[in-house]
From Swiss-Prot:
It comes from Rhodopseudomonas palustris (strain HaA2). The keyword Iron applies. NCBIfam families: NuoI, PRK05888.1-4, PRK05888.1-5. It is found in: Cell inner membrane. This is NADH-quinone oxidoreductase subunit I 2.
Amino acid sequence: MNINATARSLLLTEFVSAFFLAMRYFFKPKPTINYPFEKNPISPRFRGEHALRRYPNGEERCIACKLCEAICPAQAITIEAGPRRNDGTRRTVRYDIDMVKCIYCGLCQEACPVDAIVEGPNFEFATETREELYYDKARLLANGDRWEREIAKSIELDAPYR
């Protein structure tokens, strides 16, 4: 055994340095928050509960192009388009999302040419039954109406990166 190794083992330098490292972290402020009462701000790119948006005049944005249905890797979206209207546009008759299948990848939101389907800021949508996780058009539109202000703000903040 050489003198260096003997000195290190007698002086317990590794133990002392580990102790001081632990003490440094022990006295730092903790990053934990008191969750239900305090919430961290979420990113504008956060992908939470789905919502269908409307135009400011109240008309729904979805034009039944079915791009979101085609791009969904989990095949969680089902759309039925209604007949063409006099002005040549279409609207959806049925717009269902199976949230059990959804993987929250955000591809539906990226594919939508009119920003109709978005993933909103809500992350607290736990349910007691599986059937409550099958979202129909009415529920998606209600989510959009409820979260429109936050969704519009997130889209505006994310605009430079789109």
